[in-house]
Amino acid sequence: MKLVLVSGRSGSGKSVLLRMLEDLGYYCVDNLPLPMMGTLLEQLTGNSELVAISVDIRNMPEKDTELEKHLTNLPKGVELLSFFLNSSDEVLLKRYNETRRLHPLSHSNISLKEAIQLEGRQLEPLAKIVDHYIDTSNLNIYDLNDQVREILLGNIDKELMIKFESFGFKHGMPTEADFMFDVRFLPNPHWEPELRPMTGLDKPVQDFLNQRPLVNKFIWQIENLLRTWLPDLERNNRSYLTIAIGCTGGQHRSVYVTERLAEHFKDGRHKVTTSHRELKNAKD
């Protein structure tokens, strides 16, 4: 089991980092008291190989020796990697003033600035023993994501899951699509009596459409468009991309184009899935 421990000063980006780890497939637990960590890991053994836990000042042990004891006495087979996020007092003060959130150490007789400074002093022992110390004062969420991915995976390229979906406009447009392309202008196999009962998954329909230069040109241009912008979409911390292809009934043209595009993107760099809404609905 690989365990990532996320700690740091409040407002430095711990929750953001935890969401990034969740996108990478980690089972994430926020603000877990350290004495409960061993029990949690034992419960997850065999079920989750990637686990991430965040801790904050409110559930940290008071003694440094107790802290190190929790981090060294882990169940057998657990590989620990720890992060500490920090930001300057000025940046943290600005972030809290902008969000108007309450600092964990704020109370009636202490100011926000004093709470930020107090937390910094109390977390110093932990900051000295972590594997990776990251100052987020001048980082945005994308910069932080790149740093963490490089540490965990050895690269900053994000594996994007791409879903190609066919549909019929007469049955309504899908609401979850990031890109939508209308192929109703392409030659329609529906008007060929022998092809009408078939779908874009059948070879006669595929041969009919593959012989049309307009169809191949359209597929080529859509592929180029997507490949041009995929790197920027990946850098934008996106996990999923849904591309919808629509024709009139969702039986022939959209199905064929969806399959062709999916085939072109199954190059090992991306997880690609296909879905044919109207064909599925017909079966149901």
Swiss-Prot record:
Keyword terms: ATP-binding, GTP-binding, Nucleotide-binding
GO molecular function, one term: GTP binding
Alphabetized SUPFAM superfamilies for the sequence: P-loop containing nucleoside triphosphate hydrolases
Binding site for ATP: G8, R9, S10, G11, S12, G13, K14, S15
Keyword Secreted included in the entry's annotation: no
A Pfam cross-reference name: PapZ_C
Domain of life: Bacteria
Binding-site list for GTP: D56, I57, R58, N59
InterPro entries: P-loop_NTPase, RapZ-like, RapZ-like_N, RapZ_C
Protein function: Displays ATPase and GTPase activities.
Similarity-based family: Belongs to the RapZ-like family.
Protein name: Nucleotide-binding protein swp_0674
Source organism per UniProt: Shewanella piezotolerans (strain WP3 / JCM 13877)
